[in-house]
Each structure stands twice: as structure tokens, then as C-alpha cells.
A protein has these predicted regions:
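Residues forming the flavin
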Residues: 1-306
């Protein structure tokens, strides 16, 4: 069984930053990631980061990703891609599926930096082709150069929904409406203003009634909701669209931690079920730490700091 001083699961901003920091102090470090490319969400993000200079403000996400990869390579970090960690055990052992093979590794310490997954809202027709998450839209646009659709309705007015709406329009898509069940916009005013100036109508206190179509999305009906988020009869509005894009938050990908018996807690402010950990990311499992969105939903800059 191969042994490393430090095993990191996830080559996103948190995992790579942790690997760079650790490798600079001498330990042997390996990072496993299930994707073909490292960098996590960073390479989907073409917008500039906010914050201070030490948080890489005014630098585009994909540029930050390239910087982290260069720093990791220079530090001697071993990054193994197309490697899915399918098991985590209390004796600091991980089981990794690489190709058709299963391999076991042990570490003196393990950092789980698996990030988060997109939430979805269910409604009649939500499983039709053409209903996608905002992260999927970013992947199609910014990684593969593919338009997710021509006429798009965006559900969610947080920063992700606003930024992705603007990126879709920059690429030639028509965003027919931006819808949110909340009574006010959830994202930064600067992002909302950019979308509004493009003529996109905002429907606040509204949500989706149903997606329409047989084999794929052909249209969508929305309606106003009351303070208890119940549909108000007679307020329905129809849009002809081929894509419904959802930006309704993220949930930590904590499955490995649960598998190993890590103590968890429900914390809606941090995205749902998260591991109980201290300020250093120490979990209830000896030698197992967490960093990034798996410990609570934050920005990529926060993940790198952790």
C-alpha cells in the first residue's frame, strides 16, 4: 500500500492551496481528483474576483487556476486526475478508483476538499433535457465553448445567477427573464445592474410552476408567490424558452466524511450537512481535516485561505 505524508481529496482552489502550503514544508503530498482537469470551479470563472490583493482581487478565475497549478508543480505536488476516491476509513486510508483499477493509499494526514454540488429545484418537467444548473452552463460556455441554449430563463438572483446570466448574454444567448422566489435580489448590486441594463426583466417573489415540452424544454410558466412561497392564482406568466438555468445554491459534498463516521451537523447558513470542525479544519476523525466548500459554502477566495 502506497503511503504519503499528506493525502488531499479534491484539486480545486482549497485542495491545491493546501497542497502548495504543505509541500513547501517538506512532506510528500498527493492530490486526487475525479476530473480530467484540476482547478475545480476556477477554470469556469472568467469574471474577476472581488476582495483584497492578497485574495487575488481583480484576477479572473481561470488565471488564478493556472497560477495555482504552476505553484503546485513547482512545489513538487503530485496531482492524480481521473481518480475517484470511493472510500475513506478511520485509520486514514483512502480507496481510489483509477481507470479500471482500485488502489489503496495511507496518509499521516488527510484533507477532504471535495467542494460542493449544485442544488436543483423540483417542479413538473424539471427532468427534461434543457433544465440545467448554472455551473453546468459555465462548464459548457467557458470550458467547451458550447452554448447551452438560445432562449434561457434564469432561476436565482444570487451572484452566480447574475454573473452567469451576463456571461450567457455576452456569448449571444437571450436571457428572457431572471426569476427568484425571494422578494429582493440576492446578489451584489453591481452584478444586478449589469444584467438589468441589458434589458432582462426581474421577476422577484416568483418561481417556476412547470417546464413545458415532450422531449426537451419548449417553454416555462412562472407565477408569483406569497410570503409563504405559495403560488398566487392568476399571476401565471409564460415564456418560450429552450433552456431553464438554475442558480439556487450549493450543498457540501460530504459523502466521504459521512462514510467514515465523521461527526456532522445541520447548518443551513453553511449549506446544509457539514462536518463539525474547529478553526483549523480538524474533524472528529483523528488526522482528517476539511477545507473549502465541503466545510461550508463560501467564495473560492475563502476556500484558498482555509
Amino acid at each position: 500500500m502506497k503511503r504519503y505524508d499528506l493525502i488531499i481529496v479534491g484539486a480545486g482552489p482549497a485542495g491545491l492551496s493546501a497542497a502548495i502550503e504543505a509541500a513547501g514544508k517538506g512532506p510528500t503530498v498527493v492530490v486526487f481528483d475525479e476530473n480530467e482537469k484540476p482547478g475545480g470551479q476556477l477554470f469556469k470563472q472568467i469574471h474577476k474576483f472581488f476582495g483584497s490583493r492578497e485574495h487575488r482581487a481583480k484576477i479572473r478565475g481561470y488565471v488564478i487556476g493556472k497560477q495555482l497549478l504552476e505553484e503546485a508543480d513547482a512545489a513538487g505536488v503530485k496531482v492524480v486526475l481521473n481518480a475517484t476516491v470511493i472510500g475513506l476509513y478511520q485509520d486514514k486510508e483512502v480507496v481510489v478508483k483509477i481507470g479500471d483499477g482500485i488502489r489503496h493509499y495511507k496518509g499521516d494526514s488527510i484533507i477532504i476538499a471535495t467542494g460542493a454540488a449544485e442544488n436543483m429545484v423540483t417542479f413538473p418537467g424539471w427532468t427534461l433535457p434543457g433544465v440545467i444548473g448554472a455551473g453546468a452552463a459555465q462548464t459548457m460556455l467557458n470550458l467547451h465553448g458550447i452554448l447551452p441554449g438560445e432562449k434561457i430563463l434564469m432561476l436565482g438572483s444570487g451572484n452566480v445567477g447574475l454573473v452567469v446570466s451576463f456571461q450567457l448574454m455576452q456569448c449571444g444567448c437571450e436571457v428572457v427573464a431572471l426569476v427568484d422566489a425571494a422578494p429582493r435580489v440576492g446578489g451584489y448590486g453591481v452584478h444586478a445592474s449589469k444584467v438589468a441594463r441589458c434589458g432582462v426583466p426581474f421577476y422577484l417573489s416568483h418561481t417556476i410552476v412547470e417546464a413545458e415540452g415532450d422531449d426537451c424544454v419548449k417553454g416555462v410558466t412562472i407565477a408569483e408567490v406569497d410570503e409563504k412561497f405559495r403560488f398566487i392564482p392568476g399571476t401565471e406568466k409564460h415564456f418560450d424558452v429552450d433552456t431553464i438555468c438554475m442558480a439556487v445554491g450549493l450543498s457540501p459534498m460530504s459523502q466521504l466524511l459521512k462514510m467514515a463516521g465523521c461527526r456532522m451537523e445541520d447548518n443551513p447558513k453553511r449549506g446544509g450537512q457539514v462536518p463539525v470542525c474547529d478553526e483549523y479544519g480538524r474533524t472528529s476523525l483523528p488526522g482528517v481535516f476539511v477545507a473549502g466548500d465541503v466545510s461550508g459554502i463560501e467564495e473560492a477566495s475563502s476556500a484558498m485561505i482555509e
